[in-house]
């Protein structure tokens, strides 16, 4: 695309130069015959026109030849000075070639009308419009040719065309096969770029299923398999690159982390789209799921345990040649968690995540103090007391947010037909789109937390969930549970309830 753009710019520059050469007058002055210029060999120079006239009186004929400056040509398309005069009986003629006025004019009107009409509006318009039309046609032709070449080179298939990926991906290969080969080959950092691009460029988009902070999410198909395609606008290239980079972290793949498939930049001939292809989960986000359905005790434990497992894997550092750095999510909420067909969760939207290098005790990007969703921000983020140099601080902020997600899940747990309506955390304390200051006042100054209904005390599973929540919400981040501890507690609860994950 860059090569095509450069070629187009060169073509346009050439056309402009040709047009300028065609339309701009030459630097040399026009030389005219001048009957009064005896000292200059009867020649004058002008930037306007040459003029000649003949006036017939009762006793003689007066001839006049001279230069007319451009400033005196009023109006420019049909100057008054060049028009014949019926009152004086003068016949006039203006022209724009050297010594073109050194002619004999008849004293009759027909010649003057014919000659002066040479600078009439129709002819003048034709002279000007000719080169302009040529330039426009050449320009449109050039744009059309370059556009067609670009579309052919970067075509987006409107129907599935397996022949496009046959050289790289054998017939009958599924996404599951590709991912399995990748995870068992030892790399663990995502599919090869060529395979990613091949997959992305043979996906057929089906329907838009949502919009987020950085773009739109579509359901697509590749070889009959459904995939999710997150499309970023070109101005969000940094966000797209960052999320793709995090997803391809070595050893990140986990059943409770959204399965990454491919990243590609696609040019549709008009603008560039940045694609992030992942597994498709028809239930959508946990936020959507809880709005639509209530859950059983078993369903609640599966949702909570799988979320904790995903976060524990993110937070965990795996040491070794194929190790994985510890990662903090920084924007954990029910809208960034997806529900799978089997009723478990996977964590998505890693665009704001940060990775920790334990060898140097550094974070891989300069973190912003306040990123993420205000409603889910931990107290230390809201009051700006978080220690940005200490990676554990980011993990503890994730734990606080997960406690709020657990509260959303537990409210929808139906026991004996009794359950609460779905609500966002702090729904009764702040507006629908709260500011940082409004959240800080409630969470830090008033030290309020989401209300835990009394009915939860009548169920062991809900009692355990409530205890975990409270230990996630401590104002002191160091006192909060770790993701691994929460995972173990919920695993014990699932065993007690006889739940198979």
Curated annotation (Swiss-Prot):
Residue ranges constituting the Protein kinase domain according to the UniProt record: 203-493
Gene Ontology terms for molecular function: activin binding; activin receptor activity, type I; ATP binding; I-SMAD binding; metal ion binding; protein kinase activity; protein serine/threonine kinase activity; protein-containing complex binding
Tissue: Urogenital ridge, testis, ovary, brain and lungs.
Gene3D superfamilies recorded: CD59, Phosphorylase Kinase, domain 1, Transferase(Phosphotransferase) domain 1
Covalent link location (Glycyl lysine isopeptide (Lys-Gly) (interchain with G-Cter in SUMO)): 389
GO biological process assignments: activin receptor signaling pathway; angiogenesis; angiogenesis involved in coronary vascular morphogenesis; animal organ regeneration; anterior/posterior pattern specification; apoptotic process; artery morphogenesis; blastocyst development
Regulation: Kept in an inactive conformation by FKBP1A preventing receptor activation in absence of ligand. CD109 is another inhibitor of the receptor.
Keyword terms, alphabetized: Apoptosis, ATP-binding, Cell junction, Cell membrane, Differentiation, Disulfide bond, Glycoprotein, Growth regulation, Isopeptide bond, Kinase, Magnesium, Manganese, Membrane, Metal-binding, Nucleotide-binding, Phosphoprotein, Receptor, Serine/threonine-protein kinase, Signal, Tight junction, Transferase, Transmembrane, Transmembrane helix, Ubl conjugation
Assigned EC number: 2.7.11.30
Residue intervals on the Cytoplasmic side: 146-501
Catalytic site positions: 331
Domain of life: Eukaryota
TM regions (residue ranges): 125-145
Primary location class: membrane
PTM description: Phosphorylated at basal levels in the absence of ligand. Activated upon phosphorylation by TGFBR2, mainly in the GS domain. Phosphorylation in the GS domain abrogates FKBP1A-binding. N-Glycosylated.
Residues the record lists as Phosphoserine modifications: 163, 185, 187, 189
PANTHER family hit by this protein: TGF-BETA RECEPTOR TYPE-1 (PTHR23255:SF61), TRANSFORMING GROWTH FACTOR-BETA RECEPTOR TYPE I AND II (PTHR23255)
Function: Transmembrane serine/threonine kinase forming with the TGF-beta type II serine/threonine kinase receptor, TGFBR2, the non-promiscuous receptor for the TGF-beta cytokines TGFB1, TGFB2 and TGFB3. Transduces the TGFB1, TGFB2 and TGFB3 signal from the cell surface to the cytoplasm and is thus regulating a plethora of physiological and pathological processes including cell cycle arrest in epithelial and hematopoietic cells, control of mesenchymal cell proliferation and differentiation, wound healing, extracellular matrix production, immunosuppression and carcinogenesis.
Binding partners and assembly: Homodimer; in the endoplasmic reticulum but also at the cell membrane. Heterohexamer; TGFB1, TGFB2 and TGFB3 homodimeric ligands assemble a functional receptor composed of two TGFBR1 and TGFBR2 heterodimers to form a ligand-receptor heterohexamer. The respective affinity of TGBRB1 and TGFBR2 for the ligands may modulate the kinetics of assembly of the receptor and may explain the different biological activities of TGFB1, TGFB2 and TGFB3.
Name of the protein in its database record: TGF-beta receptor type-1
Organism: Rattus norvegicus (Rat)
């Amino acid at each position: 695309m860059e090569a095509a753009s450069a070629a187009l710019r060169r073509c346009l520059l050439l056309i402009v130069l040709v047009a300028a050469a065609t339309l701009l007058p030459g630097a040399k002055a026009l030389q005219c015959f001048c009957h009064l210029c005896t000292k200059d060999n009867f020649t004058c120079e002008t930037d306007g026109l040459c003029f000649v006239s003949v006036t017939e009186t009762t006793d003689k004929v007066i001839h006049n030849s001279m230069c007319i400056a451009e400033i005196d040509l009023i109006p420019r398309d049909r100057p008054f000075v060049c028009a014949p005069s019926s009152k004086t009986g003068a016949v006039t003629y203006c022209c724009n070639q050297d010594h073109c006025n050194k002619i004999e004019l008849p004293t009759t009107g027909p010649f003057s009308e014919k000659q002066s009409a040479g600078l009439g509006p129709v002819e003048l318009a034709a002279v000007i419009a000719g080169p302009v039309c040529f330039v426009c046609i050449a320009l449109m032709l050039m744009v059309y040719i370059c556009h067609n070449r670009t579309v052919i080179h970067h075509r987006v298939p409107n129907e599935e065309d397996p022949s496009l990926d046959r050289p790289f991906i054998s017939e009958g290969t599924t996404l599951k096969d590709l991912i399995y080969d990748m995870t068992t080959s030892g790399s663990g950092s995502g599919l090869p770029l060529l395979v990613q691009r091949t997959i992305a460029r043979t996906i057929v988009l089906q329907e838009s299923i949502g919009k987020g902070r950085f773009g739109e999410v579509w359901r697509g198909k590749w070889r009959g398999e459904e995939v999710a395609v997150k499309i970023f606008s070109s101005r969000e290239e940094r966000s797209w690159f960052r999320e793709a980079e995090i997803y391809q972290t070595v050893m990140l793949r986990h059943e409770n982390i959204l399965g990454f498939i491919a990243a590609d930049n696609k040019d549709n001939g008009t603008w560039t789209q940045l694609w992030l292809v992942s597994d498709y989960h028809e239930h959508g986000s946990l936020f959507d799921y809880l709005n639509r359905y209530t859950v059983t005790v078993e369903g609640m434990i599966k949702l909570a345990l799988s979320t904790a497992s995903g976060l524990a894997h993110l937070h965990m550092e795996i040491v070794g040649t194929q190790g994985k750095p510890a990662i903090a999510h920084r924007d954990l909420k029910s809208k960034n968690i997806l529900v799978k067909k089997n009723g478990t969760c996977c964590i998505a939207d890693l665009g704001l995540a940060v990775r920790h290098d334990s060898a140097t005790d550094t974070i891989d990007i300069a973190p912003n103090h306040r990123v993420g969703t205000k409603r889910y921000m931990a107290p230390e983020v809201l009051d700006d007391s978080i220690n940005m140099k200490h990676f554990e601080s980011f993990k503890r902020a994730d734990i606080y947010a997960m406690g709020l997600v657990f509260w959303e899940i537990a409210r929808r747990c139906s026991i004996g037909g009794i359950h609460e309506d779905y609500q966002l955390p702090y729904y009764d304390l702040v507006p629908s789109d709260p500011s940082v200051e409004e959240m800080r006042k409630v969470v830090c100054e008033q030290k309020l937390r989401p209300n835990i209904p009394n009915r939860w005390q009548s169920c062991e599973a809900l009692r355990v969930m409530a205890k975990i929540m409270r230990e996630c919400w401590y104002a002191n981040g160091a006192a909060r549970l770790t993701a691994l501890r929460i995972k173990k507690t919920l695993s014990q609860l699932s065993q007690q309830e006889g739940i198979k994950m």
